[in-house]
C-alpha cells in the first residue's frame, strides 16, 4: 500500500502551474491527493496529473470566520483520510494545513515558502503576518524556502530556528 501524500494550495492555479507534472510523477510512488479551493482547474489537475482532488474553499485574504471553517474542514479531512504527509505551498494553505496536520498528528508536515508577504507589510499587519508564518513553521516538521532570498528573510526575521532546506537549485 502506498503512503498517502496531500499537496495543498490556497488556489488551484498554484498546483496547476507550479507543480505541473510533479503530481503525476509523485503518484508513481505515493497516493497523491491535491487539495485546494474549488474551481475548473481542479478538474484539469485530476485529468492531467491522474490524481484525486478534494475541494476545500480557502480565502487568500484574512477572514477569521471563513479561515476557521476552512481549518475545521481540513481537520475533518485529515482525521478521515489519515495522510502520511501533508505538503503545502502558498501562505494561507500553509498556515491552515500545517495547523490541521499538527492537530491530527500527521507524521510529516512540510511547507514550501514560495515567497513572503510580511517583508513588504508594515506595522501591525507585518507583525500579524510574521506571527502567522511562525505558527506555520512551528506546526511543520520540514520547511523549504524556494530560494536563498526567502531563506535569508526567514532567518533575518527569526521566523524559525528549524533547519531550512532549499529544494534542488531553488526558485520553484
Task: Spell out what each predicted region is.
Residues 3-9, 101-116, 144:
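Active-site proximal beta-strand in glycosyltransferases
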Residues 14-19, 65-72, 107-108, 117-139:
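Nucleotide-sugar donor phosphate/pyrophosphate-binding loop at the beta->alpha transition
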Residues 28-66, 161-168:
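Conserved nucleotide-sugar phosphate-binding/catalytic loop shared by glycosyltransferases and other
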Residues 1-37, 49-51:
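N-terminal subdomain of nucleotide-sugar transferases
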Residues 40-44, 139-172:
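A short, active-site helix/loop in glycosyltransferases that binds the activated sugar's phosphate group
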Residues 77-84:
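Glycine-rich phosphate-binding loop signature in dinucleotide/nucleotide-binding domains
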Residues 88-94:
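Short His-centered aromatic/hydrophobic patch
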